[in-house]
Amino acid sequence: YYAMCTWFDETCGQLIDLLEKRNLRDDTIIVYVTDNGWSQNPERNGYAPRSKQTPYEGGIRTPIMFSWPNGDLKNGKRKDVVSSIDLFPTVLAATGARVPDGLPGLNLMDSLKEQKPVKRKGIFGETFAHDVTDVENPEASLVFRWTIEGKWKLLLTYDGEVNRYKSTHPRTEKRPQLFNLLKDPKEEKNLAKDNPEVVARLAAKIGKWWPVKERKVLTKWE
């Protein structure tokens, strides 16, 4: 794992050196994004639980970094909730192109240049059994869906087929999981039982975002 981190750092350096050698660095936007989190398991050569392939913060909360010397971006670390769906409208805005209406992502340029808060009410995501097994019917391997809105994160568990990834997705808790990410970033205390109105509201938003038809899910604490 650490060797891969070192290799990645070296190859990024080689790319930046090439851009500088060709006098392209100042006008080039570099965006770092990764597909999943990986918390190293100190006891073995692999990732820790609630990390890679899971819907918990250790698996989905990853950094996105922008670098653009001539773009007048403000240096700093932000904690806004953003997504890879924001990359397309952001790069369009950087080039001066018109950002079409109706895109699912947000243009982050104002935030990057002026450190304005990202105007996002909530964000949604889903997890499958490693990958979507059937692109014509993505529900077949749907395992989790979630939404993050403010301090709240609601995680719903579905009955999609996991096949050989059963050990990765044991789904021991099939009831809704609600976490206060500000107080409990490691998602150790499920607050769903004590906050049914929050669960109902966020579950309805998940259903509106992507209305699934075949999968079974519990949206109430039973």
For each predicted feature, which ranges?
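C-terminal cap/loop subdomain of S1 sulfatases and analogous C-terminal strand-loop tails that border
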Residues: W38-R44, R50, D80, I85-F88, ...
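A long, amphipathic alpha-helix that forms part
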Residues: Y1-T28, G71, A94
